[in-house]
Amino acid sequence: MKLDSIDITHCQLVKSTRTARIYRSDTYAIKCLALDFDIPPHNAKFEVSILNKLGNKCKHILPLLESKATDNNDLLLLFPFEEMNLYEFMQMHYKRDRRKKNPYYDLLNPSIPIVADPPVQKYTNQLDVNRYSLSFFRQMVEGIAFLHENKIIHRDIKPQNIMLTNNTSTVSPKLYIIDFGISYDMANNSQTSAEPMDSKVTDISTGIYKAPEVLFGVKCYDGGVDVWSLLIIISQWFQRETSRMGHVPAMIDDGSDDMNSDGSDFRLICSIFEKLGIPSIQKWEEVAQHGSVDAFVGMFGADGDGKYVLDQEKDVQISIVERNMPRLDEIADVKVKQKFINCILGMVSFSPNERWSCQRILQELEKP
């Protein structure tokens, strides 16, 4: 075994979290998990079970090469090493806006008030959406579709859990989904016994990538939570700018883009409703039947605000999408842009029963 020949104490520590340490050894990544320190819903044994089940069958899932338990009750997982994740890739395409303000013009123009505060620095999104967006979208959908076909919900789809091939000079890098630490295998009796399918934990996903049904306590969710997370990633490609270096904005926010703030679910809920409208509780049956219906009605009323995106006429729906993802206008191919809009409108439903599956998205992408 390769792991038998690796001394982890001599490996480079790449990342450390509450539940895992990631090391690099040449062309390999080693994930070290403490078997006696699982923090639910993290579970090292279920993670290995899922990775072994997936094997090397999907080109968009980073394969597990080996696993090994140590005498210290740690579990070592060996993967191919990839240098960059999707969030870092998006970060590197935000460039500082170097347009300078002319102070003499302001002094000579009495109609412009003189202000003491310096202008807010802007960073412009220069990701080539014509080169990357469709390829990235298709690759991620194919990877998530494979998971769902195998009865697995990832539960933490985010750019940090999407790795890219080191060779970013190609037309479009190859993407790999990683980190199955909180994933859920609906076909694993041990996992469904510990966490019943109609009573799954809702402490899943990260920040802005949480699906709205989970935010309102629906425990019988399905793979639709992964589709929603993917929708938010898509929205990040099509934002124009940010005022904070290193921040990659999306169409919604949870307050974590503010300095010294970790964000909150309540602010995320308000942001989702501000951008996409509030449905009536009658049209959101999952929350009405299985979620925190009293909290929803108490805070937002039972009748909605009349602005829910999917209650609007089609042309209004499209304008809402384009307003929330302004760089869609930069896609040169009209058919590609229309495919994105159709898929986004299919993915944006608050009701997971109406939200498009990955297979439905792929059908749309395959259209001529």
Swiss-Prot record:
<dbReference type="InterPro" id="IPR008271">
    <property type="entry name" value="Ser/Thr_kinase_AS"/>
</dbReference>
<dbReference type="GO" id="GO:0005524">
    <property type="term" value="F:ATP binding"/>
</dbReference>
<dbReference type="GO" id="GO:0005634">
    <property type="term" value="C:nucleus"/>
</dbReference>
<keyword id="KW-0547">Nucleotide-binding</keyword>
<dbReference type="InterPro" id="IPR011009">
    <property type="entry name" value="Kinase-like_dom_sf"/>
</dbReference>
<dbReference type="GO" id="GO:0106310">
    <property type="term" value="F:protein serine kinase activity"/>
</dbReference>
<dbReference type="GO" id="GO:0004693">
    <property type="term" value="F:cyclin-dependent protein serine/threonine kinase activity"/>
</dbReference>
<keyword id="KW-0418">Kinase</keyword>
<dbReference type="InterPro" id="IPR000719">
    <property type="entry name" value="Prot_kinase_dom"/>
</dbReference>
<dbReference type="GO" id="GO:0051321">
    <property type="term" value="P:meiotic cell cycle"/>
</dbReference>
<dbReference type="Pfam" id="PF00069">
    <property type="entry name" value="Pkinase"/>
</dbReference>
<protein>
    <recommendedName>
        <fullName>Serine/threonine-protein kinase CAK1</fullName>
        <ecNumber>2.7.11.22</ecNumber>
    </recommendedName>
</protein>
<comment type="similarity">
    <text>Belongs to the protein kinase superfamily. CMGC Ser/Thr protein kinase family. CDC2/CDKX subfamily.</text>
</comment>
<keyword id="KW-0067">ATP-binding</keyword>
<dbReference type="GO" id="GO:0000086">
    <property type="term" value="P:G2/M transition of mitotic cell cycle"/>
</dbReference>
<dbReference type="GO" id="GO:0051726">
    <property type="term" value="P:regulation of cell cycle"/>
</dbReference>
<dbReference type="GO" id="GO:0004674">
    <property type="term" value="F:protein serine/threonine kinase activity"/>
</dbReference>
<keyword id="KW-0808">Transferase</keyword>
<keyword id="KW-0723">Serine/threonine-protein kinase</keyword>
<feature type="active site" description="Proton acceptor">
    <location>
        <position position="156"/>
    </location>
</feature>
<dbReference type="GO" id="GO:0005737">
    <property type="term" value="C:cytoplasm"/>
</dbReference>
<feature type="domain" description="Protein kinase">
    <location>
        <begin position="1"/>
        <end position="368"/>
    </location>
</feature>
<dbReference type="GO" id="GO:0019912">
    <property type="term" value="F:cyclin-dependent protein kinase activating kinase activity"/>
</dbReference>
<dbReference type="GO" id="GO:0060633">
    <property type="term" value="P:negative regulation of transcription initiation by RNA polymerase II"/>
</dbReference>
